[in-house]
Amino acid sequence: MQLHFAHVNGGVRIFGGNGFFSTVEDNVINGGATIDGYSGFWLGFIRNTIHGSTNFSNNTLGDPDANEFVTNTIRGNLFCHNNVPAPHVGDSGGSPNNVSGRKVDQCAAPGL
């Protein structure tokens, strides 16, 4: 899945799937975002503005540097649960997520 430089109304929901890599970068998403059960090699969720809560759960990636989840502005809560590896900055050079609500579970880690 590649989603770049888009304006999305109604939210983004990705359930399952796999592939070499997936990126959701530089988007404006109205309605929240969910990525649940993805099992590819690498996943990046970077520099998005999300109007609504975001759920990032049950994703298992092959690369130890996968699950880069940084530099997002989230107007809602950020839930991260049961991801392998846990969401992190990685080598993206990104900054912590700006979340107006709560950062829960794995996304409550310092630097995210």
Language model features with spans:
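A subset of signal/propeptide-processing and intrinsically disordered low-complexity segments
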Residues: H4, F21-S22, S92
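Leucine-rich solenoid repeat scaffolds
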Residues: G62-L112
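Feature marks extracellular polysaccharide-active and adherence modules
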Residues: H4-F5, N9, F15, E25-D26, ...
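Short, solvent-exposed linear patches
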Residues: G19, T60-G62
